[in-house]
Structures are given as C-alpha cells and as structure tokens.
Amino acid sequence: MGETKKMICLVDGEHYFPVVKDSIEILDDLEHIDVVAVVFIGGTEKLQIEDPKEYSEKLGKPVFFGPDPKKIPYDVIKKCVKKYNADIVMDLSDEPVVDYTKRFRIASIVLKEGAVYQGADFKFEPLTEYDVLEKPSIKIIGTGKRIGKTAVSAYAARVIHKHKYNPCVVAMGRGGPREPEIVEGNKIEITAEYLLEQADKGVHAASDHWEDALMSRILTVGCRRCGGGMLGDTFITNVKRGAEIANKLDSDFVIMEGSGAAIPPVKTNRQIVTVGANQPMININNFFGPFRIGLADLVIITMCEEPMATTEKIKKVEKFIKEINPSANVIPTVFRPKPVGNVEGKKVLFATTAPKVVVGKLVNYLESKYGCDVVGVTPHLSNRPLLRRDLKKYINKADLMLTELKAAAVDVATRVAIEAGLDVVYCDNIPVVIDESYGNIDDAIIEVVEMAIDDFKNNR
C-alpha cells in the first residue's frame, strides 16, 4: 500500500459518540492510515461528552475543539494540519453542521496546506506543483476568464523589465503550441503582417505569449493546456517543459502566467491574483474563489467601475479579500486602452473583448487621450461570426484597425483590415488604480518581485 498517510478526522455532535469512535477505528485499522488527531467542528444534538480532555481519553486520540461549538473552527483545522503535517483530512461530519459553502471553505484551507480533503463521496487533492524553476519567480493567476489577467501580466512584465529584473513570461493557453514556443519579443519586430504570417502557418498568433511579447517587448515562452479543474489543475499541459526551457533562456526572473482560472502546475516564490469585480459574487466568495485569493501576495481587482460593478460591490469584494487573506496587498483598478502605435487623426475601427456596457467609456477615452475618431466599434473579438458582421458594417468608414491581441484578432480582424487596405495597430489594456489612497501599482508589483527574489535566495 506504500507509505503510511497521516490523517486528521473532522467530527461533529450530530453523530453519537460510539458511531464516531467506530468510524475512526475503521480508518485507523487500515494498514496505510494513521489517524493522528481529531477536530470537533460543531453540533450539540447528540454530544454526550463536552470536556475535550474526556473526549480525547475515550477516543484514544488528541481531540481539538474550537471556542464556539456553533461555529466551525477553521483556524483549528489549519493549525492541526500544520502541527501534524497531515496528508489527509477526512470529513466525518454532515449537515446541518456543514453545508456546501462551509465544506468548500474547509477544502480551501486544507488544500492550501498541501493535504487532501476527503469525505464520503468526494476527494479534493492539492494543486500539482513541479519544483523545476532555477530562477526567482512569480505566478499571475485569476479567478476566472475575461477579467484582464493577461493585461495585468503584460503590464507587470513591463514594470519588472523597466526595473531591470530581466524577466521572461511562460504563458499557457487553450490555443498554445504542441511544443513550447519561444518568442523573442525583445529582438524581433512583431507587426500585423508578421502575426498574419504566423497564423497562416497554423500558429494561434493571438495567444497570450504573443500578446505578452508584443506589449512588453520581452522573451516569452508559449505553452498549451486543455481542461481546467475546480481547484485550478489542468487535464494536460506542457507548461512544466516551458518552465524548464525558461531556466536556459537569457533572463533572470520568470513570470508564470495562468489561463482563465487554471493555474500553472509549477512552483513559484510568490503570486499575484487578479479578481474581476464584474464576476458573480458567488464565484469570488464561494467554491474555490477563496482558495485562489488565499494564494496571493498581491490582489489586483479589475473592472472596478460602473456599470460592471457598483461602488458597493467593489467594497464588498475588497472586504472579503481582506478577510480571507489579510496579509495581501489589495489594489482596485480599471482598464484603459493604450495603442502601441500612433492613431492620432485616424478614423479608427476598434475591436475589443471588453464588455459591451463599458465600450462607450473606452471610445471616449481613446478619442480624448489619443486624438483619433472612432467610427466603429465591436466588442465581439471573441465571437468570430459577430466580429465578421461588425467588421463588414464599419470597415469602409475606417482607415485604421485598432484591436486588442486576443481571440480572433489576427486570423479575422487583422486579415480583414489588411485585405481592405487598412493600417493595423494593436492595443494594450493598462490597469489604472481607482484611488491614489491604494498606493502605486508599479510599487506593489515590484514589492512582490523583491519578496520572490529574497525567497529564492534564502531557499537555495
């Protein structure tokens, strides 16, 4: 059966003590299981032994109680997992002591400590983390898709590069290459024609590593992944190989970039997490939203403006993040477009993945900040049929295509624009802090980088 696994059992007062005792003995009798401790997590209906010492003596195991029998002692569970270096936490409780929300919170705590969380018909295992990087590193991950994680990653890469840390980005995406692909954004000129040429070769030239290379002008390594688990693992990915390649590149710092809510299975020193204020609150404060938030050294909240999120909701998100992860720096932001080329005086057709409700703000910003005339806009960059419809509607009014480098930006938007004789300029999205009281986002990013470098040096 292999090595013996150390197990902590969670029990409640809704079961009679003899039933609990027999169940723990059944587990403890298994050759590969050693029940090292028990945590009482609540319930009083059938609780016959209230004294922790007596409970421990009768059970023959150390038993830990929280201060309030009506509340699950999450901190006690966490401390016990750490104290006993537990491999498995077995949940022998049931409703009404626990419900789905409470179990997900227990799972988030247990899994972050590297233990398995298991019950009668479920089993959650910790994230896969290959310890392969030979350079200081951070992860940039998100709590969902289309919340601006890649924009944050590209921006962070520029900030890190500007401060002379010589970074490279290892990005994984659903359209990434079969073998990890190096893009020397620091050396080659990435033009619309170049990207279209790559697309004609079968490359997904709007993949995240191309966006990072274009926007940040640094080395990137593109990888692929398929499937995303509840916790963040992927079904299959070649990003471990991508990380190993990054070890050999001419860079001194590695940024591992997630994909949607999926997390690269590579161990890093520190982590930045993006949370979309526009996401349903249940996806932030329930399921494994708290797990991802709990990983962060810096949380960047994106989409912090009406109509995507009310001021009240933004405050609610911020408050929850600080409750889950009080040590993390939290910065609320909005995105604003930044063309990487000159658009002044041009009649612009603007293609974006931004939600339709905020497009008007982006258009006004582009026109006032960069002196262009936006004659048409499509928010359907990730919907090819609707994108083609919008391009057909506006293409004859424009002399320049301004597009984010995402989804169908190359194989549809760029191709249609070039065929129509339009210039093509790509557009970055810059996170802007909503209030200076939150501090400087560049400083916050560099603080995480320096913590990562210190960790790397101290653990060599």
UniProtKB/Swiss-Prot annotation:
Keyword Coiled coil attributed: no
Give start-end of the signal peptide.
none
Q: How does activity depend on pH?
A: Optimum pH is 5.0-7.5.
* Biological process terms in GO annotation: gluconeogenesis
Any one cellular-component term (Gene Ontology): cytoplasm
Q: Which reaction does it catalyse?
A: (2R)-2,3-bisphosphoglycerate + ATP + H(+) = cyclic (2R)-2,3-bisphosphoglycerate + ADP + phosphate
Thermal behaviour (record text): Optimum temperature is 75-80 degrees Celsius.
Q: Share what the entry says about its subunit structure, partners included.
A: Homodimer.
Question: What role is this protein assigned?
Answer: Catalyzes the formation of cyclic 2,3-diphosphoglycerate (cDPG) by formation of an intramolecular phosphoanhydride bond at the expense of ATP. It is also able to catalyze the hydrolysis of cDPG but with significant slower rates (8-10 times). May be involved in thermoadaptation.
This protein's name: Cyclic 2,3-diphosphoglycerate synthetase
Source organism per UniProt: Methanothermus fervidus (strain ATCC 43054 / DSM 2088 / JCM 10308 / V24 S)
Organism placement in taxonomy: Archaea, Methanobacteriati, Methanobacteriota, Methanomada group, Methanobacteria
